[in-house]
Amino acid sequence: MKKLLDNITAEVTKAFVEAGYEEKFGKVTLSNRPDLCEFQCNGAMAAAKQYKKAPFMIADDVAARLQGQEMFASVESVKPGFLNLKLSEEYLAEYLREMQADERYGCEKTAEPKTIIVDYGGANVAKPLHVGHLRSAVIGESVKRMSRYIGHNVIGDVHLGDWGLQMGLIITELHERKPELVYFDEAYEGEYPEEAPFTISELEEIYPTASGKSKEDAAYKEAAMQATFELQKGRRGYIALWKHILSVSIADLKKNYDSLNVSFDLWKGESDADPYIAPMAEQMKKDGFAYMSEGALVVDVSEERDAKEIPPCMILKSDGASLYNTTDLATIVWRMKDYHPDELIYVVDKRQELYFTQVFRCARKTGLVKPETGLKFLGFGTMNGKDGKPFKTREGGVMRLQYLLESVNEEMLKKITENQKAKENLEISEEEAKETAKMIALAAIKYGDLSNQASKDYIFDIDRFTSFEGNTGPYILYTIVRIKSILNKYHSMGKDESGAVIEAAHSASEKNLMLALSGFGAMMENAYEETAPHKICSYIYELANAFNSFYHETKIMSEENEQIQKSYIRLLELTKSVLETCIDLLGFKAPERM
């Protein structure tokens, strides 16, 4: 099914060609003056230069050929040379009937599906998720869902920080606390226990303690570095301990990500890249890309067109140790080997842009990826508190993500309870109220984040995000629940709309709702192409507003003409379907009632 804009452009282009002008001038866009028209074409302005003719004369020529077409209710040529277009109500209704019959609501699947890996999440094992992890998880999940909806094969990878000094620190601290553990006995040859010798809460306390000690005590740090070295060389007891650290951490991380409705196809980490580092570095040297500089192995990645200096990409330190660059490049190696992706998207803090420029250029220069492989850096801004500074706890520390979710849940539960009392509607059980609060809280957090362009910083304002009015997640959910309520009421009266179709609009507000719905396919294509979930948010806010205007101006349930009422119900069903599809792409759902 073609996008509505494409259909209109095709008709206007045909008129340009019939009038003797090139087809490139027939492009139609949404009107930037909705008070005057719905769509516009400015092609006559550009054609005037080429044909040395007054633009209004060209616009008049084209308008004359469009007059009387079934597609348009009105076609106006406006000086100095604009074409103002309004669709006919019948044509628009026909387009919506097609949309409703199409399970994808007019958003065509790509004809050329790609394999895309989205790298997001970036959690570290043995550490709790904090608010700094929110944006990567929320944006990455939405990018994954959008890309899948367009028809691509998408693989989400959490890319865990599970290798390096933090592991040595934990092993060293465990050895100090529990030296009797069999993992530290090098002579031991038996099977290691299946159960971990620590819980997640112990693990989360061990790491910061060990980290603090290593900063004060040089011998302790040396022991941690030695433990890291032995782990990476494959010492049996340390590998067994490391596996316990991983399984305990991942189980907890999955619980946390589940509460955000975020999931990953791969739970790979830096450790998975480790076996590829030595052969990769060797190949880079052999091919003449990598060379020694001040004892370190580096690859030049600067280009003539650079406005500022791009330093070389370091592959190995002077002591032969690897860095984040090394791990990220080796990760590209195994991803290309195992999954042959056409594109890799990294959802990370925008402050890492220079770093990823180095990594991507190095990967291209050394042939780790094919020339046509896409490498995309989707950098996000900071989530700030009301003071405009990075979000902190009242004590000034970094807030755990779990605590943030709980505080928004509590705020939503309070609002739901107050609403129930105000309405004297005590039908909702405590259990349902809690579940509903959880769903709305998640929408508040995710929509609050995703409605901002990813690269922009934003202020996390709990009062604004949890409001049922304005451009918020709860407002969108309230709109969906309102539609569900009307549909339930209609069906509870024993009425049935089967066989009915969406008719031509009976009012301006109904037409506005229909126009908003018709833009779904074009919006989705644009949001995917620009990797921009905020475009979905803008669209559903506009759609929710259009529906609520229609709802307030139309007596849906008391409409006496049964055919018109059925048409309204069909229109509501389509609105609900499109809104629900969109919020699913953003990563949240609507409750049955609020």
Predicted regions and their residues:
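Secondary-structure boundary elements
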Residues: 91-106
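Non-catalytic interaction-recognition regions
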Residues: 1-93, 110-594
